[in-house]
């Protein structure tokens, strides 16, 4: 099962966050990082990162920029907005070329071993349908915005239609922040 989280890394005193789908297995985590992302670049050489379990809206925010209220555990950044954060040491890196419906891409598969975790005192909010749609928009946005991923024109059109459809629903069921985040993604992709 793929779990959507926010990964936080640090390189040269600069913090980075990104929404990533990860696989949890016992005390390990496995994630696939696309070439060209800051997280890929950071974890090419850095050995520590955090996995942040956050509200869905924070996953969508993470696709747009690295600004956040960071806390630190042994110089590993994690998000103040997390329900909890798990800290990992990279134990394996594998590089593969992938060709799927999203196009051709270079992946780095990271395996991390858990070294610690912290639970924050953040209270969950009720789930809104716009939360899930924003996460789906963020996944599509991250693929369309990454210039290193070559996407077939038909798939690109389908993804563009999906992101517009999700936005139309968010406008009906989401709050102000949901709508603003969705509009920013569409604007950045020149779809609005």
Model-predicted regions and their roles:
Residues 5, 18, 86-88, 108-110:
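Hydrophobic residues positioned within well-ordered beta-strands of beta-sheet architectures
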Residues 93-151:
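Flexible glycine-rich active-site/ligand-binding loops centered on an Asp-His dyad
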């Amino acid at each position: 099962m793929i779990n959507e989280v926010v990964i936080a890394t640090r390189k040269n005193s600069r913090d980075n966050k990104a929404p990533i789908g990860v696989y949890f297995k016992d005390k390990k985590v496995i994630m696939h990082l696309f070439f060209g992302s800051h997280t890929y670049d950071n974890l090419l050489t850095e050995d520590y990162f955090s996995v942040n379990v956050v509200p869905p809206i924070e996953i969508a925010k993470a696709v747009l920029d690295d600004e956040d209220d960071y806390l630190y555990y042994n110089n590993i950044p994690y998000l103040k907005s997390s329900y909890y954060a798990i800290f990992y040491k990279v134990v394996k890196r594998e590089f593969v070329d992938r060709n799927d419906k999203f196009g051709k891409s270079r992946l780095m598969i990271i395996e991390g071993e858990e070294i610690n975790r912290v639970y924050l005192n953040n209270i969950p909010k009720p789930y809104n349908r716009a939360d899930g749609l924003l996460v789906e928009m963020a996944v599509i946005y991250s693929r369309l915005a990454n210039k290193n991923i070559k996407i077939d024109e038909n798939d690109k059109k389908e993804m563009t239609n999906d992101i517009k459809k999700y936005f139309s629903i968010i406008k009906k069921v989401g709050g102000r922040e949901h709508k603003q985040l969705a509009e920013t993604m569409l604007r950045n992709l020149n779809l609005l």
